[in-house]
């Protein structure tokens, strides 16, 4: 199962942590894994290229780990724009989790200053 937790601080999404493999199908033909990867990777690319936010990123292919969080130096306006991108990914993943509940879990966690705490 893939578990995705979105970080929230002061009602704004500030990042996410995804871990695990969906197990829906063998590697290379797992549509659930492909969907999760596409949504999360698109979010990271949009943050960097559309909003010019140098996100903090940690990824490990073997474990399926991907952690993305906003650096401390982002402005209030950047945080608000990033929140919209994170919420878009969150909504897409929630819909996927409704269709594939045994393969994908999506949660929101708040309060941690450092994404590595998740």
Locate predicted features:
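Short, conserved glycine- and acidic-residue-centered signature motifs
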Residues: 32, 36
């Amino acid at each position: 199962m893939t578990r995705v937790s979105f970080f929230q601080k002061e009602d704004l999404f500030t990042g996410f942590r995804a871990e695990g493999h969906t197990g829906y199908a063998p590697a290379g033909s797992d549509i659930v894994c492909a969907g999760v990867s596409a949504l999360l990777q698109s979010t990271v690319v949009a943050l960097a290229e559309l909003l010019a936010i140098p996100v903090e990123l940690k990824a490990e292919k073997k474990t399926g780990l991907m952690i993305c969080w906003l650096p401390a130096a982002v402005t209030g306006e950047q945080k608000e724009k990033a929140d919209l991108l994170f919420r878009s990914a969150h909504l897409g993943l929630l819909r996927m989790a409704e269709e594939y509940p045994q393969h994908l879990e999506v949660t929101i966690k708040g309060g941690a200053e450092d994404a590595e705490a998740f």
